Amino acid sequence: MILYIDTSQREDVTISLDGQVFKTASKKEKSQRLLPFIDEVLRKKKLSLKDLTEIKVNTGPGSFTGLKVGVSVAQALGWSLNIPVNGKDMKKGEVIDIKYKIE
C-alpha cells in the first residue's frame, strides 16, 4: 500500500492511500496533526503502518515549513518501517528520490 503525503497547502493536510484521498483542515499546526491523521485514516481502512510498502511526499511548490513537516514525517516513517520514500515534485509532475531507500 502506497501512502502519499501532501502538506504543501497552508490550511490543510492531504493524504492518499492507493488513490483514495483524505483531507483535513484544522487550526492545529501540521506538525501536530499529520501523524494522528495518518493513524486515523489507517484505522478507518483497517490497516496499520506495517501495511505500507512505499511513501511518496509532495516536495513542492508550497509552504516551506509545511513541506519540511511532510518530508520529515515521510523520512521518519520510511526509516522506521524500512520502506522506500520518494518525493513527488508537483510542479514538474515527476517522482524523484528524496534521500535514500533503506536497505
Functional labels for PLM-detected ranges:
Residues M1-K50, I83-E103:
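Oxyanion-binding and handling regions
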Residues R10, G60-P61:
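Short glycine-rich anion-binding loops that position phosphate/pyrophosphate groups of nucleotides
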Residues K28, S63-F64:
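A generic secondary-structure micro-motif detector
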Residues E54, N58-T59, T65-I83:
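DPxDG-like acidic metal-binding loop motif
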